[in-house]
Design a protein with these regions (language model features):
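Carbohydrate-active catalytic/glycan-binding domains of CAZyme proteins
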Residues: 1-246
């Protein structure tokens, strides 16, 4: 059956999911385990069934770490393209993944040069390390937390004049507002990080690979929820690049 996991503000950022519970159909109507009594989110495995979650090629569940250095020749199946094949905008190189930016951005209902991973937890940390030097003020690359083209955050590097800036921008109902920006050096790799604790999201960056600095403070994940943005598929975290402005 289908269900949801709301956060502490009763918002749903992980979308509609599939749940499995034992059903007792000894009476006139089926009764799910425990009936109307609240229950824990996990149950013991039935007798004779082995839990192979995260083993032998099966995807993990619960708390886990997913790390991808893009050293394989093909993309992991957990990476998602939007409105088109992933392979249309990525190139696997000796240094990792290279995104070839489209002449479109995530505010449009078009294919985007964004590689997405679904948000699976109400509490998580996601990070990406990139080497990037934009050529003009329309170039942008970084990460995004995305519900749809009208509701999302983008966190990445662009150019203003002769300088490079790290930008955090929030888009709600199609209206964008910059929550923070800071001048940044691009000679070395930059690590971009987003952390979530329920409804609270924080966007951080590291220029030395060790300590992280925050940009924009703590922001709400409200626009990433199905309550605010509509739909039922949940939010995604993405690696994003564009050549037409963010």
């Amino acid at each position: 059956f289908l269900g949801i996991r709301p956060n502490e503000k009763n918002r749903v950022n992980t979308g509609r999911e599939t749940f499995i519970l034992p059903v007792d159909w000894s009476g006139t109507f089926p009764v799910f385990e425990n009936g109307l009594i609240p229950m824990k989110p996990t149950l013991k495995m039935p007798s004779g069934v082995e839990n192979q979650t995260g083993k032998n090629g099966y995807l993990p569940s619960g708390n886990f770490v997913f790390k991808d250095d893009f050293s394989d020749k093909t993309l992991d199946l957990r990476w998602i393209g939007l409105r088109g094949p992933r392979e249309d905008f990525v190139d696997m190189t000796d240094k990792g993944l290279r995104i070839i930016p489209f002449t479109s951005n995530i505010n449009e209902v078009k294919p985007t040069s964004t590689l997405f991973y679904r948000q699976q937890h109400n509490q998580f940390t996601a990070a990406a390390t990139m080497e990037y030097k934009p050529k003009n003020e329309k170039d942008f690359a970084g990460i995004t937390c995305y519900q749809n083209e009208r509701y999302h955050y983008v966190f990445g590097i662009t150019k203003k004049g002769k300088d490079y800036y790290l930008i955090l921008q929030r888009t709600e109902k199609g209206q964008a507002s910059v929550l923070g920006e800071v001048k940044i050096e691009t000679e070395k790799p930059v690590t971009l990080q987003v952390t979530a604790n329920g409804d609270d999201y924080r966007f951080n960056y590291s220029i030395d690979g060790k300590g992280f600095l925050n940009l924009g403070g703590t922001v709400s994940g409200d626009i990433l929820s199905t309550n605010e943005a509509g739909g039922f598929t949940g939010a995604m975290i993405g690696l994003y690049a564009t050549s037409v402005g963010y």
